[in-house]
């Protein structure tokens, strides 16, 4: 998992968005960003604030975890460090591409403060390698775009400033 990468439970039934509504009995799958800690808190804050509208994960991570690839219309619940729901998002686009081919439009949607593709890649490579995934130009990356739906909390959501985020915490 990398900055903005996600983990999706394979045994939670998918919820589909249809004509702007989600079925009343739809069960969203959990969406975890990075590992618990400052990075997750920072990324969750970006989602809730409406800034982060995309995430990236390694295809090899999906395969190792037995996870399904998100599909357009999937409803997912962003969770905090304790696995508690923070907000719902709906998947709007999914692409599986080589790491070398990640487009700038994705980096802009992920909106994690990167000012170039090289900076985005360096940050993601550092994270993925810190959790024991080797990456190169041909590594397949799952790019997922989403829209923010319901926010589950009325009170403040812990925010972490960008400078407090370290790939190893």
PLM features: residue spans?
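Mixed-charge, low-complexity intrinsically disordered regions
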Residues: 1-88, 94-169
């Amino acid at each position: 998992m990398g900055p903005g990468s996600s983990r999706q439970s394979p045994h939670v039934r998918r919820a589909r968005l249809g004509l702007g509504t989600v079925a009343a009995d739809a069960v969203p799958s959990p969406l975890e960003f990075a590992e618990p800690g400052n990075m997750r808190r920072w990324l969750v804050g970006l989602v809730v604030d409406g800034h982060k509208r995309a995430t990236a994960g390694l295809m090899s991570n999906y395969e190792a975890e037995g996870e399904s690839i998100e599909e357009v219309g999937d409803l997912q619940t962003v969770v905090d460090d304790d696995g508690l729901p923070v907000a719902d998002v709906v998947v709007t686009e999914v692409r599986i591409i080589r790491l070398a081919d990640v487009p700038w439009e994705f980096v802009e949607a992920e909106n994690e403060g990167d000012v170039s593709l090289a900076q985005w890649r360096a940050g993601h490579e550092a994270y993925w390698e810190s959790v024991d995934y080797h990456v190169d130009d041909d590594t397949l990356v799952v790019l997922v775009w989403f829209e923010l739906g319901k926010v589950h909390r009325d009170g403040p959501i812990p925010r972490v400033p960008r400078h407090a985020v370290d790939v190893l915490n």
